[in-house]
């Protein structure tokens, strides 16, 4: 492969975002963190429980709406009134559950991975937060032992300018450095805890 091909390949891998769009910046950084966390660590297997729960709730809400529409079509109002009333209540109840799930369970979590070894299983989670009109990107990496429930976390709160250049290009190497720093800190705590327990 020639130099031109290498340059074109590198250019295709670059991610460019509108640096003035906070939502786009956050999602681009989330994708870069997820790629670094899971792509460089084959021992981590991505889990989709949170996403599947959200999709199931959305599917149920849509199914209720479709059922109400179909029932009203075959049984015109006012005969369909009880079914429509039930459907409206069920729809908003499901939306409420979905909101609670997103606010209190997901909490900005965009990556979940399971690490299995001979001794135990550990659940890794990556979450982020970036408030509107704020340039601070808060990244939190946590690990939880599935047996005893002990949870540890490391956080990084830096300006998004630390990971994106003036042209809006996401600097994957700088993102990887930050992710590796948090991951290694948690891994070091994990090793220290295991050595203390063995002593």
Swiss-Prot record:
- InterPro entries from the UniProt entry: Spc2/SPCS2
Membrane topology type: Multi-pass membrane protein
Q: Which domain of life is it from?
A: Eukaryota
Q: What is its main location?
A: endoplasmic reticulum
Topological domain (Cytoplasmic) residues are 1-49, 105-199
Which residues does the entry place in the Lumenal compartment?
73-81
List locations, semicolon-separated.
Endoplasmic reticulum membrane
Membrane-spanning residues: 50-72, 82-104
Q: Which GO terms describe its biological process?
A: protein targeting to ER; signal peptide processing
- Which controlled-vocabulary keywords does the entry list? Endoplasmic reticulum, Membrane, Transmembrane, Transmembrane helix
| A single Gene Ontology CC term | endomembrane system
Q: Which family does it belong to?
A: Belongs to the SPCS2 family.
Q: How does it assemble?
A: Component of the signal peptidase complex (SPC) composed of a catalytic subunit twr/SEC11 and three accessory subunits Spase12/SPCS1, Spase25/SPCS2 and Spase22-23/SPCS3. The complex induces a local thinning of the ER membrane which is used to measure the length of the signal peptide (SP) h-region of protein substrates. This ensures the selectivity of the complex towards h-regions shorter than 18-20 amino acids.
Q: Which function does this protein serve? A: Component of the signal peptidase complex (SPC) which catalyzes the cleavage of N-terminal signal sequences from nascent proteins as they are translocated into the lumen of the endoplasmic reticulum. Enhances the enzymatic activity of SPC and facilitates the interactions between different components of the translocation site.
Mind telling me what this protein is named? Signal peptidase complex subunit 2
Query: Which classification does the entry list for the species?
Result: Eukaryota, Metazoa, Ecdysozoa, Arthropoda, Hexapoda
